[in-house]
Amino acid sequence: MLSAAFITLLRSGGNQVKKRVLLSSILLQDHRQATPACYFSTSEARCSRFDPDGSGQPATWDNFGIWDNRIDEPILLPPSIKYGKPIPKISLENVGCASLIGKRKENEDRFGFAQLTEEVLYFAVYDGHGGPAAADFCHTHMEKCVMDLLPREKDLETVLTLAFLEIDKAFASYAHLSADASLLTSGTTATVALLRDGVELVVASVGDSRALLCRKGKPMKLTTDHTPERKDEKERIKKFGGFVAWNSLGQPHVNGRLAMTRSIGDLDLKASGVIAEPETTRIKLYHADDSFLVLTTDGINFMVNSQEICDFVNQCHDPKEAAHSVTEQAIQYGTEDNSTAVVVPFGAWGKYKNSEITFSFSRSFASSGRWA
């Protein structure tokens, strides 16, 4: 339960917060008014009454991972009072993103991020195949679709599920009305994350683009690839009358063509069980432990494992450098596909920087592909 002293402290610092002054600065400025429960020194401010990670152990303000952060983020005052702990505001200007074409003739990856409401942020990556049309359509319309659903539906998992299905239906209408027959075979992955109040993180995905959270320096996977290798996905394909065939590299494809079992678009494969309904994940952030969220396309995922992604990002000074580092590393490892990364910093950014990086020597250098 949030103490009265903390509530008073947050409220008294409201004006400074509006001026983008960190709560840590307020605490240091007001140290002479500290209650007996807290004591301060010139090196750090300590308080035994707050436990940011739920460990039950006395905590220092530095434990939150935001007080000495190199990214100066203000505090979200209402959520901080609501949840009883400091919640940093995620500034979109600090989000890192990078996209490289690789050895492809065209970059079919798309990405985006935006503030949808005062409480909700949006982050997304789309990896198109069979042309960029489906990825472009999602990039153009998904954000608004989600925004329109938010006032009518409070559950973010439901919002994203409805948005994916609506966008897929809208793309089908668009493709059937178009004179361009290639739109019928255009499709895309979609991995979309919504962050509410700086604490509630919800991710929805179809295809094999991924989202992972770095917690205490370790990767926490928030998505699972939709491929014919999954028993449940393969059974659905067969139930719909489709089949799975393997190419010369041993990669399974739906009807011998598509390397994924869920996507937006791919209208010619809907009858074979390729669906647009996403799988969703909801997680509560702990800014004392959580360094960043990263969204990646398969040009990265098939070459750089999750721990390596965490390590590469943790070595970087800021998220922009990190996004470029991850995409460039995939190129160095031999990917031929488009590579895209979106890096969203959280409270523990920079807290788990390691001096050593463990590399995977079991890496496959076979180029990824959507089509057999």
From Swiss-Prot:
Name of protein: Protein phosphatase Mn(2+)-dependent 1K
Record's keyword terms, sorted: Hydrolase, Manganese, Metal-binding, Mitochondrion, Phosphoprotein, Protein phosphatase, Transit peptide
Xref: InterPro entries: PP2C, PP2C_BS, PPM-type-like_dom_sf, PPM-type_phosphatase-like_dom
Entry similarity comment: Belongs to the PP2C family.
Deletion phenotype: Mice are born at the expected Mendelian ratio and display no developmental abnormalities if fed normal diet. However high-protein diet, either during pregnancy or during the postnatal period, results in increased plasma BCAA levels and premature mortality in neonates.
Gene Ontology cellular component annotations, sorted alphabetically: mitochondrial matrix; mitochondrion
SMART domains found in the cross-reference section: PP2C_SIG, PP2Cc
Transmembrane spans: none
